[in-house]
């Protein structure tokens, strides 16, 4: 089971909802491969793109846009600084926080931790001599105390429990 997630959010300094995407608008999107696929999955949940079926790469060149807009690929940490250049931008919560944005109050949409392959997990090799200790650590990481710690340390939602 997951431990925590730094969720993606869809942000805008120009619009109050995704329904306001203008014809020919722009969406800033993370340029790195794994986070771009996550960003596109989030946009798909909002009816802006359709993800191709199968196990192929998911990127801005493989999705079907369901509205008339363009993507601009940007290095993740730069997205929050250049937010005024786009109608919307999909930004990692930790980058948003570093740029003075709160994922819980400023994002129009936030990525869910439920069944999310991007959640942080504890992994170990079967048969490890420390399996008992690691199992105890896993139990502790999924405790109410850890959940409370995450929620209190990142009240803006830039890190959320995934259990």
Regions inferred by a protein language model and the residue ranges of each:
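Short beta-strand->loop
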Residues: 1-4, 72, 88, 92, ...
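A conserved helix-loop-strand patch within extracytoplasmic ligand-binding domains
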Residues: 1-49, 147
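Solvent-exposed loop/turn segments at secondary-structure junctions
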Residues: 16-17, 33-36, 77-79, 94-98, ...
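Short amphipathic alpha-helical coupling segments at ligand-binding clamshell hinges
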Residues: 23-24, 129-140
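A local structural motif
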Residues: 23-24, 48-73
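Periplasmic-binding protein-like
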Residues: 37-44, 141-161
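Short helices/loops that flank or line small-molecule/ion binding pockets
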Residues: 41-42, 61-90, 95
């Amino acid at each position: 089971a997951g431990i925590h997630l730094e969720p993606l959010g869809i942000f805008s300094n120009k619009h109050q909802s995704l329904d306001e995407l203008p014809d020919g608008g722009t969406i800033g999107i993370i340029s790195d491969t794994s986070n771009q696929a996550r960003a596109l999955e989030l946009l798909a949940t909002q009816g802006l793109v359709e993800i191709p079926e199968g196990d192929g790469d998911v990127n801005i060149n493989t999705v079907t846009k369901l509205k008339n807009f363009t993507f601009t690929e940007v290095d993740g940490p730069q997205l929050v600084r250049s937010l005024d250049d786009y109608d919307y931008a999909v930004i990692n919560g930790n980058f948003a926080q570093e740029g003075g944005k709160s994922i819980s109050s400023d994002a129009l949409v936030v990525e869910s931790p439920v069944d999310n392959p991007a959640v942080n997990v504890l992994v170990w090799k079967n048969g490890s001599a420390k399996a008992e200790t690691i199992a105890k650590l896993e139990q502790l990481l999924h405790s109410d105390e850890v959940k409370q710690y995450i929620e209190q340390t990142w009240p803006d939602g830039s890190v959320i429990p995934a259990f």
